[in-house]
């Protein structure tokens, strides 16, 4: 039976040219991840647009459809990394956990974000912050402030439970300095898992003796 004119009018052929939105999102995400790996391994300044295109399997100028500049990619890497980590921390904060357990989970998330093989975002944030332009920094700083506020709340809860001395404004900075430096020396496959490392970090920071339940 032949189709009516009205039925035929409802069938609109897809236009050629720009990919579907879902394709766009997937391609953009892949481009961000590949760029994050390059920036972590080679550094932002030494990574060229050709390097990025090659890693993403694109022609040299194709990635300009997704980002106008290399600076935009850097900003996207940092924003995506902070947003992912913040989401994990907010999930922990939404639970009514004892302070020590909440702290343990925060440390685990932080170290996994830093050290897991597929997580290059935060390392780029730590070591390429000066490469980011001032306009892009404000967005990242807002996410960073929310991230740090959750840590401050848990530290305050630890203080109230008697597990942390009166907090100072430097406590979190000292702690982050120690945790973030693990990116310089921790090697995957060295015989210690990230979770085991997190347990050691919690014991050290809270001064929990080995073998004593916390």
Regions found by a protein language model. Name each.
Residues 115-135, 184:
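Amphipathic alpha-helical segments used for helix-helix packing
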Residues 76, 90-120:
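Hydrophobic alpha-helical connector segments
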Residues 30, 34, 38-72, 76:
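Helix-turn-helix
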Residues 1-26, 96, 213-214:
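N-terminal intrinsically disordered/low-complexity leader segments
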Residues 83-87, 124, 134-160, 169-173, ...:
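Amphipathic alpha-helical packing segments from all-alpha helical-bundle domains
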Residues 41-45, 95-96, 117, 161:
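Short coil/turn segments at alpha/beta junctions that flank glycine-rich nucleotide-binding fingerprints
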Residues 4-6, 165-184, 196-208:
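Hydrophobic alpha-helical segments that form the core
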